[in-house]
Amino acid sequence: MHRAPSPTAEQPPGRGDNTRRTPQPRFKASAPAMALPRTLGELQLYRVLQRANLLSYYETFIQQGGDDVQQLCEAGEEEFLEIMALVGMATKPLHVRRLQKALREWATNPGLFSQPVPAVPVSSIPLFKISETAGTRKGSMSNGHGSPGEKAGSARSFSPKSPLELGEKLSPLPGGPGAGDPRIWPGQSTPESDVGAGGEEEAGSPPFSPPAGGGVSEGPGVGGVAAGGAGGGPDRLEPEMVRMVVESVERIFRSFPRGDTGEIASLLKLNKKLARSVGHIFEMDDHDAQKEEEIRKYSVIYGRLDSKRREGKQLSLHELTINEAAAQFCMRDNTLLLRRVELFSLSRQVARESTYLSSLKGSRLHSEELGGPPLKKLKQEVGEQSHNEIQQPPPGPESYAPPYRPSLEEDSASLSGESLDGHLQAVGSCPRLTPPPADLPLALPAHGLWSRHILQQTLMDEGLRLARLVSHDRVGRLSPCVPAKPPLAEFEEGLLDRCPAPGPHPALVEGRRSSVKVEAEASRQ
């Protein structure tokens, strides 16, 4: 029954104390690893707070559900102050300023937040590889829960390539294909880094990426891939956006005057430097694939060789669209390479139109995803249905009495001034003013296209019609104008003023009034 002594019990007291204390520092060192991000939203929040030196608020943001950086950027003033109060930052305005500055940098230049998270332990959930545009919301990416077989490999391969990725994203590699060329798109990962990432980088095409060879000016070896490569990579616009740009360029180019050979020669003579750089393009054949590549290289508006752009700053969607539009214009008219002011104006016009059409289509697709028809179609169908129901009332035994009045003004007018004929018609048509429940227009159609305004109008019409029915029924029972119903003394004077009838009724009334006056005078005497 005696248990064997443990190995730690046989050790000296000093050594045993050391062994008992060693797990405590390890536990403290691994405690921050529990707060490392596990999803894309948490990773974006981690990097923004790390940029602002506010990582102490990270767990508070996660506990409050603030793992959406885009929500912080799009929040209004009151909503943003409420969020700051929830995370305990409202009483520290300097922290709020730093966070706002980091959010502005994240919105304008998400490439600065692409550095990997340091010290990722092997036992934690592996972080998937995200692109340089992790700050954008577009793109379907996994939530980081990989298969059990690749967890250890992904976590191990993340730390060794961190310095390489950081240097590669911030500055071009000295020995790479784009050495010395600041126009090479920053952050293009090497094949080795792609293999270590688990092949999850092709999840979606980010919106903030250079166009198909138009946003980036590559060298001769890289330009062929950018111009003729298949599929959309991280340095391209979306195919749908490119299609909108091409359609807008073709529409504008129909009414655009093209330059002639004499204009080309005169412009090249005036600018010798420009002639040395783009003069060979005008000598190339139109069917030469190299010509399109050269046009895309020298038609770039943003991100040129001679531009003073901050290193590592990515092009925005508007800039990429302008570059693509400029390339499309120059491929249709090569003389625009020499008229860059005019080219820039045309490209900006195309970018505005394409961005508007893209946002309009996105809103329509969003409404279709919610399950409802487009708003314009809904209004048209509701208007047509209400017009048809008003013009074509449902048939019945007495079709001249509609089931409901089409307007509120007619009901109020008919109730305000009624003649004798109106009373008689109301009394005679009382059964027809209450159609059977099947004919009531209160039942919604099967397709559910009734608008709220039409439903309220119908309910008001029904209420007015019921009130009119009650008032007419009461007047019919009390009116002396209707035969077989003797008048009552309490309603005589009011009703005789509204519907005077021929006969002895006025004389009787006057006689009764004179007799009442005589009796009153006799009682006074």
Swiss-Prot record:
It comes from the Eukaryota. One of its GO terms (cellular component) is nucleus. Sumoylation by EGR2 represses EGR2 transcriptional activity in hindbrain. Pfam families: NCD2 (PF04905), SAM_NCD1 (PF04904). Residues 35-113 are annotated as: NCD1. Signal peptide: none annotated. The modification Phosphoserine is found at residues 6, 157, 159, 162, 171, 479. GO terms for biological process: endochondral ossification; myelination; negative regulation of transcription by RNA polymerase III; regulation of DNA-templated transcription; regulation of epidermis development; Schwann cell differentiation. It is found in: Nucleus. Highly expressed in brain and thymus, and at lower levels in spleen, kidney, heart and testis. Isoform 1 is predominantly expressed in testis, whereas isoform 3 is more abundant in thymus. Residues 353-384 are annotated as: Necessary for nuclear localization. Residues 212-234 have a biased composition (Gly residues). There is a cross-link at residues 379, 517 (Glycyl lysine isopeptide (Lys-Gly) (interchain with G-Cter in SUMO1)). The NAB conserved domain 1 (NCD1) interacts with EGR1 inhibitory domain and mediates multimerization. The NAB conserved domain 2 (NCD2) is necessary for transcriptional repression. Homomultimers may associate with EGR1 bound to DNA. Belongs to the NAB family. Acts as a transcriptional repressor for zinc finger transcription factors EGR1 and EGR2. Isoform 2 lacks repression ability. This is NGFI-A-binding protein 2. The gene is Nab2.
